Design a protein with these regions (language model features):
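Catalytic binding pocket for nucleotide-activated donors in carbohydrate/polymer assembly enzymes
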Residues: 430-494, 499
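A charged, aromatic-enriched C-terminal amphipathic alpha-helix characteristic of glycosyltransferases
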Residues: 487-521
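Membrane-proximal helix-turn-helix segments that form the acceptor-binding/catalytic region
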Residues: 217-224, 259-279
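Active-site donor-binding acidic/aromatic loop of nucleotide-activated sugar
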Residues: 388-393, 405-416
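Short N-terminal targeting/anchoring amphipathic segment
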Residues: 202-212, 216-237
Length: 526
């Protein structure tokens, strides 16, 4: 059995995944090496299981978003709260008890509940539309209780507040009885409900990590077999914790992912590298750096590129138009000259369109780029050269008053990876001319076999293989024509991507992985 112990932790509390409303403006970059590896094992029908250490009341929707809902899961918090064989139900607003004098105010973001003219509660929803949490307020408008809902349709835990500050959190069982209490204002000490003392070794713990360690150890003693292999995505929250908990004779694979483990952090990971048997590295330049930093451990380091198999390969050839996706990055500012080059190419080239894509941009930022694009068109390009054919909006008679003139460019503001996946479905070419190309856009491009044009060399794009590297934005037109004029070059990029994906996601990779593991287990005598 292969066990994956994911590094899905929150930004504020170590053992808690963030519970954030769907409309929060930061781009949710959730994809990581664990999703890539789970899918790899699933496709080859290799027995694997997720061991989730963190508190994740919305775990099922999270796994569903990434296409791994069918994965076998053991959740420590489910065990701690005695949540076994739970019947999933959809929780509606009317399922919750409200006083008869409550008024409900609906907004596009949340439902505010008023009582006697004052805010009494706020009901938040998750990305998928389920009730994710409810905040209750006192007469002074301060938060008094925060109910966190499980995505299976019940209250998972309640945070109680004292003068607007979190005091303690009760973790509930299916009957709504608290099993254990985490004192948030007292260093996180944990108190077990004496009624359930028989399920724990003690009634008081210094912090939640001791409770997790106890149940993790209990699980290993019950389920673990000698030949099991543990895949650990490296994370400062859990590396040492896991190496301390896992028996020394088990095979441990450490996995590095650039969005979680920057190259600057490699020098701090020596203890993890020494205790791991195999280290999987997501980028070739990272592999080289590690071999230079740790020559005595170089045999442990191996390369595995991440791919997101939620994307479908080669869909753009089903469309007459060549759609170009242009990556906006407001943190670097908007390059007017780059916009001009792209718009000029669209204006001069038949059957081409461009999508300007941003991640969780503000309304002001989107208005700014739209205004700049319109300014460039008015001043340097004729609007009529960017017009599509006339659209009569499905009208029976193509009268002049029914006609709508569409333009060959559009703006898309995306909140998460699924939005980008949807946007890229029929895209022929990705253009990212930022100083630091967006990591997930590059991974998505390779995964979908879409060639990319960049100003900066990266490990994900190889010149004339699966992309085009330009030294100046004025070279954009030449690069774009290379991939849009004929299908030959575009097909070559697709074939190159398919070969890369096969190398890192199919039987070819698993044979290599088994070989690396065999080398280790032979040494250990397993």
């Amino acid at each position: 059995m292969y066990y994956f112990i994911p590094a899905w932790y929150g930004s504020n509390r170590q053992w808690h995944a963030d519970v954030t409303p769907w409309y929060y403006s930061s781009f949710r970059f959730e994809f990581d090496d664990t999703f890539n590896q789970i899918r790899l094992f699933q496709r080859q029908e290799i027995a694997s299981r997720l061991l989730v250490l963190s508190y994740q009341p919305h775990l099922r929707y999270f796994l569903h978003r990434h296409g791994v809902l069918e994965t076998e899961v053991y959740s420590i918090f489910d065990d701690l709260q005695d949540l076994h064989d739970i019947h999933t139900q959809v929780l509606n607003l009317r399922d919750i008890e409200w006083d008869s004098d409550c008024q409900f105010l609906y907004s596009p973001f949340a439902i505010v509940v008023q009582k006697n003219g004052k805010k009494y509660a706020k009901v938040e929803h998750g990305v998928e539309g389920f009730i994710s949490d409810i905040q209750y307020f006192d007469n002074n408008g301060q938060i008094s209780k925060h109910y966190i809902m499980d995505d299976r349709g019940f209250v998972s835990s309640v945070i109680y507040f004292d003068d607007g500050q979190p005091a303690y959190q009760d973790y509930l069982d299916p009957k709504g009885i608290w099993r254990f209490r985490e004192h948030l204002n007292e260093g996180g000490r944990v108190e077990v409900n004496p009624i359930f003392g028989y399920r724990f070794k003690q009634l008081h713990y210094a912090d939640i990590s001791q409770l997790i360690a106890e149940y993790f150890d209990k699980y290993l003693k019950r389920k673990q077999e000698k030949q099991d292999i543990f895949i650990i995505p490296s994370h400062p929250h859990h590396d040492q914790f896991l190496f301390d908990c896992l028996p020394s004779d088990t095979t441990k694979i450490l996995s590095l992912f650039i969005n979680r483990n920057s190259q600057a952090s490699f020098k701090d990971l020596a203890p993890s590298f020494e205790q791991a048997d195999v280290v999987l590295v997501d980028r070739e330049d990272s592999l080289q750096l590690l071999q230079d930093l740790y020559p005595e451990l170089s045999d442990k380091f191996h390369h595995l590129s991440p791919f997101d198999t939620r994307l479908r390969l080669g869909r753009s050839q089903t469309r007459k138009e060549s759609i170009i996706y242009y990556q906006l990055d407001f943190s670097e500012g908007i390059d007017r000259q780059a916009l001009f080059q792209v718009l000029s190419f669209i204006a001069e080239t038949k059957n081409t369109e461009v999508i300007f894509g941003a991640f969780s941009a503000s309304q002001e930022q989107m208005e700014e780029v739209e205004s700049l694009v319109n300014e460039i068109i008015q001043g340097q390009i004729h609007t009529d050269s960017l017009e599509k054919g006339l659209d009569y909006g499905g009208a029976e008679n193509p009268l002049e008053e029914n006609q709508e003139q569409e333009l060959r460019f559009q703006f898309v503001n995306m909140n998460d990876e699924l939005d980008l996946i949807k946007t890229l479905e029929f895209v022929r070419l990705i253009v990212d001319l930022n100083k630091q190309p967006h990591l997930y856009t590059q991974i998505a491009g390779i995964s979908a076999g879409i060639p990319q044009i960049n100003l900066v060399e990266t490990v994900y794009v190889e010149h004339l293989k699966n992309g085009y590297l330009i030294s100046d934005v004025t070279e954009f037109s030449k690069a774009a024509h290379y991939y849009t004029d004929k299908l030959k070059e575009w097909n070559q990029a697709l074939v190159y991507s398919i070969d890369k994906i096969k190398e890192h996601t199919g039987q070819r990779f698993l044979d290599k992985l088994h070989h690396w593991i065999e080398e280790v287990t032979d040494v250990k005598g397993l």
